[in-house]
Amino acid sequence: MLRINWVSAALASSLLWGFIIWVLVDETGSSSEVTRWTGWITSNFTWLYIVTQDVWFIFILYLLGTKYKDVKLGRDDEEPAFDYYEWFSMMFACGIGVGLYTFSVMEPISYYRGAVSKLPIVNDDQRAQQAITLTLFHWGLHGWIPYVLVAMTLGVVCYRHGRPMTIRSAFYPLFGENINGLFGDAIDALSIATTTFGVCTSLGLGVTTIASTMNRLNSDVDPNDDATKILIIWLITAVACTSVILGLKNGIRRLSKITFSIGLILLFGIIVADNPWFLLNSFVQSMGHYVQWVTQLGWDTDTWPASEAIMRDTGAWHYLAWGAKGESGAIARTLSTRGATNLTDTELNTMWGVRTDDGFMNTWTLFYWGWWISWAPFVGMFIARISRGRTVGEVIKGAFIAPVLFGFFYLTVLGSLGIKMERIAELALTTAPADVDWRSGDVNCTNLGYADDGTPTTAGSIQLAKEGYYALSCRPTSSHILDIVEPYGKLSTLFQAMILIAIILYFITSSDSGSYVDDLISAMGYENPPVLQKVYWACTEGALAQALVTSGGLKVVQGVSIVCGLPFTFALNFMVVSLWRALKDEFNDEAQQKTRKGFNTCMLDVLEGYEPETAGANAPDRKTRVVAALKNFIYPFDAIRKAKIAVGTDEKFASINAAVVTGVLWTAIGLLASTKAGAGAHSVAWLFYLILIFCIANIRREVRASRNILGNIMEDYTAAALYPLALAQMEHEAESDPKLA
C-alpha cells in the first residue's frame, strides 16, 4: 500500500516530468530558454546569492559560540545511531558526490589558464595559487552552509518537537499548524523538485567523466556518444534503486563507507607515488591563502567586469544612465558605438589591466551557490536523519568543518598536481613567448602541438604524452583527472580504474541518497516507504539526468542549477528565523514565551480557500476575508486607517497616513498601467511600489509591537510585498478588539 502525500508528489512530478518531456521534445528551444532564465537571474539576483551565503555563515558561526550549541538533535539521553567514521563517510559521500572528481583538476586549470583575476597577481606563481584558492572557495565553508542550516533546523524541530521528517516541518516554529495545508504541500513539492534537479546536475556532470574514464581504459567506448552516456545513467540508476530499496543501514551506509574508503586509498596512493612534501607544502600554503582571502571572495559580486560587459554591448549602453531622451540620447547614439569600439582596442584593454571574464560569475560562483543550495533539502535532510543523538555543536563541527578540511586536502592535492603538469608541459613545448601569456591566461594550443579535440599532434607533444605529461589547458576537461595520474607508470592504470570505480560509487550514493530523501518527503516522513515509491523517484532522477545530458550538456546543467537554487534561497532565509525560534524555545526564552505566536488570522489561509483547519474562533468568515483582500488591492485606505488607530495614532493623522499610502499605490498602478509610459516611467512605478512596501511593513511592525506578536522587521517586509493580504490581516487584527478598532 502506498504511503504518499498526493498533493506534494503530484506537484513535484508535474514539474519534473513536464521539464523532462519539454527537453526531450524541444532540445534547442529548452536549452535556449534555460540560458535566458539563467541570464535574468544572474543579472538581477547575483547580490542575493552572495549576501545570503555570507549572512548564513555568520549565523552558524555565532551559534557555535552560544549555549544553543548544546541542544541535542533528539532526546537529551539519546545516543548517536552511527559511529564517527560511518557518520562522516555518509556525509562526505552524500554532500560532495561525484563533483569532487569532476572539478578537482579541471577547475584549477580553468582558472590558471583562463581570464581570471580575482586576487592580486604579479607573476605566474601567484596565478597558480589563485587557481587553488578559488577552487577551495567554491568547495569550502560557503558550500556546506546550506546543508548545515537545513540539517540543524530539521534535527531540532523534528526530533525534539515530534514533527515528521519533511522540509515543511522546518518552518513549524515560524508558521505553526499552517504548514499542514497547501502551503506545506507546496514547500515539500519545491523541495522534491529542487533535490531532484540538484542531484541530476551532479549526475549530468559525472556521466561525462565516467565515459571519458571508460574510454581511457577501453578505446572502443565513445565518450561523446549520447547513447553511451544514457546507458551509463540507467545502469547506475538501477544500482542506486537497489541500494535505496535496501534502506539506510543496509544499502546507503555500507555503500558510503566503501565509496569513502576507496577515495581515501586513491588519494594517499597518489600522494605517495608523487612528491608528498610538495603536496603537503601546497596544502598548508593554500589553507593560509584561503583564510586570508575568503572574506573578499565571499562578498565579491563581479561588479566591474559585469559593467564592462554592458559597455561592450552596443545595444545596452542606455542601461548605464537614465538619459532624458532614453535610447535616442547621446549615450545611446554616440558613446555606444565609440565605446564598444574602444573596448576592443588592445591599448585600452592593456591600460585597464588584466581583467576577469564577464561570464565568470555565472559560470562558476553563481553556478556553485545554486548547486549547493539546490542540494540543501536533500543533503540537509540526510544529515539530520543520520545525526540523531548529536548536538547542534557536533553537527556544525562534524558536518561543517571536518568535510571542508578533508575536501580541501583532496582538492589541493589533485589541483596542485594538475597545475604542476601544466607547467611542465608548457616549459617543454613552448617555442615562443606568445605561446603562453601568464598575465591573461591565454594559451596557444596549436603552437604547443594540440588539435582542437586535445589530441597531441606534434613530435614534441606526442613524446611528452608517452611520458605521461600533457598541457591540460589544451585537453578535454573530462580527461584532466585521468591525465594527472599518467606519469606513474604501471600504477597509472590502477589509479584510473580506481577513479572509475570511485566516480561510479559516488554517482550511485548521490542518486540513492537523493531518491531516499524524495521518498521520505513524499511519504510525509515515513521512514520505510513502499518499494514502488522508491523505484518511481529513482527512475525520475534517471530520466531527468538523461534529459539534461542530451539537451545541451554542461551549459544547461549549470543553468538549471542556478534557476533551481533561487526559490530555495528565499526558503533558507525563513529557515534561519525558524531555527532561531526553535532554539530559543528549548531554553524557554522569557521574551519569546511572553509574546503571541501570530496574528488572529494568517495570510497563508488564502491557500486553503480561507477555510483552514487552524482558523481560530474569532476569525472572520470566508466572504469577509475575500472581500477585504480584494478591496485592499486597490483601496487600502480603510485598512491602514484602522491599523494606525489600533496602535494609538490620532484619528486625523491616521487618515492622513492612509491617504498618503493610498496615493502611493494609485501612482504605482497608474504608471504601470499607462500604455504611453516608457521604461523610465515603469521604473518609477516600481520605486513607488517599494515605498508602498516600506510604509505597510512599518505599520505592520507597529501593530505587532502593540499586540506583543512574535516577529521581526524582515517578516514584515516580506508580508508587505503581498500587501492586500497583509492589510487584510492587520484590519482583522484591529477589528478583533473593539477598544482599539
How should these model regions be labeled?
Residues 179-504, 526, 551-553:
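Membrane-embedded translocation segments of transport machinery
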Residues 15, 48-65, 263-274, 406-417, ...:
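Hydrophobic alpha-helical segments of multi-pass membrane transport proteins
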Residues 1, 593-741:
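Intracellular leaflet-associated regions of eukaryotic membrane-associated proteins
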Residues 3-4, 15-23, 57-59, 96-100, ...:
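Helix-loop-helix module between adjacent transmembrane segments
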Residues 1-7, 41-47, 76-94, 122-141, ...:
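Transmembrane-helix boundary/entry motifs in multi-pass membrane transporters
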Residues 32-38, 65-84, 109-134, 156-182, ...:
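Flexible loop linkers connecting adjacent transmembrane helices
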Residues 1-3, 27-42, 63-80, 131-138, ...:
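Membrane-water interface regions at transmembrane-helix termini and the short interhelical loops
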Residues 1-127, 245, 577-583:
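N-terminal alpha-helical transmembrane segments of multi-pass membrane transport
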